[in-house]
Amino acid sequence: MYGKLLICATASINVININHYIVELKQHFDEVNILFSPSSKNFINTDVLKLFCDNLYDEIKDPLLNHINIVENHEYILVLPASANTINKIANGICDNLLTTVCLTGYQKLFIFPNMNIRMWGNPFLQKNIDLLKNNDVKVYSPDMNKSFEISSGRYKNNITMPNIENVLNFVLNNEKRPLD
């Protein structure tokens, strides 16, 4: 077992599949915990997800959650799926919710898995921010492009999709981070 893992789930439509990742990752980690961005809760029932993970951090139900304690309690922090909005916030040090505050505090343990439509992915501001993250030792997965259903257009299109669970695990374990000082 590889220690404790925190999944920071953002408001990307593929967050609806996060339970599959939790179940599979639990086979490899001592604990798999989850923290949702406020907007991601519009896509998923967090009460159901409590059945899959070890702990679900909810800043609304527990406003006294401490970002430093959360970071210190985990060896790995995954932003899965990572929306363009959250990637841009992390790169620019914007801490307007518990998820982005945890990511900024624990950047040395951070792994980002982008998931968005191809137009957002190609945005030069986003690409600049991804380069900024990579240049500061944040591990950003080179995303997969697959045909997927795009909610906004109602059509199947090539988009940036979440990697399969095996690729997530391999990326994390092959790019382990140094501990925080």
Curated annotation (Swiss-Prot):
Active-site residues, record numbering mapped to chain: H67
Keywords: Flavoprotein, FMN, Lyase, Plasmid
InterPro entries for the chain: Flavin_trans-like (IPR036551), Flavoprotein (IPR003382)
SUPFAM superfamilies the UniProt entry points to: Homo-oligomeric flavin-containing Cys decarboxylases, HFCD
Reported function: Catalyzes the removal of two reducing equivalents (oxidative decarboxylation) from the cysteine residue of the C-terminal meso-lanthionine of epidermin to form a --C==C-- double bond.
Gene Ontology process terms (BP): coenzyme A biosynthetic process
A Pfam family of this chain: Flavoprotein
Recorded consequence of changing G93 to A/D: Loss of FMN binding
Family statement: Belongs to the HFCD (homooligomeric flavin containing Cys decarboxylase) superfamily.
Protein name: Epidermin decarboxylase
Gene label: epiD
EC number per UniProt: 4.1.1.-
